[in-house]
Amino acid sequence: MALYRNLYLLASLGLSSAAPSKVQRAPDSSIHARAVCTPTAGGDSSTDDVPAITEALSSCGNGGTIVFPEGSTYYLNSVLDLGSCSDCDIQVEGLLKFASDTDYWSGRTAMISVSNVDGLKLRSLTGSGVIDGNGQDAWDLFASDSSYSRPTLLYITGGSNLEISGLRQKNPPNVFNSVKGGATNVVFSNLKMDANSKSDNPPKNTDGFDIGESTYVTITEVTVVNDDDCVAFKPSSNYVTVDTISCTGSHGISVGSLGKSSDDSVKNIYVTGATMINSTKAAGIKTYPSGGDHGTSTVSNVTFNDFTVDNSDYAFQIQSCYGEDDDYCEENPGNAKLTDIVVSSFSGTTSDKYDPVVANLDCGADGTCGISISGFDVKAPSGKSEVLCANTPSDLGVTCTSGASG
């Protein structure tokens, strides 16, 4: 893992052994200052500010800067499409607040769409910028109608050299951030993300990050409070780094789910410096079993390092029967191929839900379970530390107890 990261760093720096030129060149007279636009806000929630923002993008979206000033509020009653941006800098220092209109948002993919954009900074320089998905009505409706289709707050598909930083994202109707479509060189940094319901209905499916088909995605210095996966590595994610993250109330940092209806793969993932609070698991891998329409899942070169477990139900979990019941999996065992999976330097205390069990490793009987564990110092509240295992290697690195499931 370190090798690919170092090679990528060297390539990105463009290191050269050539000596610096002593020739002094006159300034290029063709270089101009970046154009700066500040959209005009309508001033109340009945006015959709998206057209004004779109106009600013038309004027300044090609190499320019769009500024939402500190203390300002913009009401977004429709999809904000950033597709016209090219090497643009969008500085959100005020509040972008989306409408809660469940009829309008029904079936829509995104609230902010970033499709095939090359060069985008969506950021707050002051840390005061907020993007509010206003998802309460969507969560309440979904609680009574699970067929209601909700949009992702920020949906990236394709494109390259994208930076999202310094912002607070709050209350998305569904997922916070999604990356797919072959996007490459995407950085999320210094983000505060929270989904908090004011009713008895939880903010369901509010994944922090769904990383699908993409390469070289980095997530760093992020705090997430939500009600689903904190980070999910979806099919075809490759070369993803997560460094310094705190997740509260989540389903953990997860590979998958994979293999539901096709052959899926996830590879070259490195996660380090995670604090997992009140999560169903700190980290894990979720794969569907064989049989039916399910495909084969391949997971390779994945490292989970330096995790602090704080009242999470499991420290680590492998599920090879995801989405099916035990009877099905007796007839159709898991066949996922797991290779070079490293779990290292886990510490802390689980919740009492499964005490004395702290981890549940259910590798598929018809698959491959190439996993190693080291520096695993997690205990249940009782002080015990049992690890349930099935079909794991003899040199796993921890003492196993039979009885794994999932």
From Swiss-Prot:
EC number: 3.2.1.-
Location of this chain's protein in the cell: Secreted
Glycosylation sites: N278, N301
Signal peptide: 1-18
GO CC terms: extracellular region
Highest taxon of the lineage: Eukaryota
Pfam families associated with the record: Glyco_hydro_28
Active-site annotation: D228 (proton donor), H251
Alphabetized UniProt keyword annotations: Carbohydrate metabolism, Cell wall biogenesis/degradation, Glycoprotein, Glycosidase, Hydrolase, Polysaccharide degradation, Repeat, Secreted, Signal
InterPro entries the UniProt entry points to: Glyco_hydro_28, PbH1, Pectin_lyas_fold, Pectin_lyase_fold/virulence
First and last residues of every PbH1 repeat: 183-213, 214-257, 266-289, 299-320, 333-375
SMART domains referenced in this protein's UniProt entry, alphabetically: PbH1
GO MF annotation list: polygalacturonase activity
Example GO biological process: cell wall organization
Summary of the function given for this chain in its UniProt record: Pectinolytic enzyme involved in the degradation of xylogalacturonan (xga), a galacturonan backbone heavily substituted with xylose, and which is one important component of the hairy regions of pectin. Activity requires a galacturonic acid backbone substituted with xylose.
Protein family: Belongs to the glycosyl hydrolase 28 family.
Listed name of the protein: Endo-xylogalacturonan hydrolase A
Organism annotation: Aspergillus tubingensis
Gene for this chain: xghA
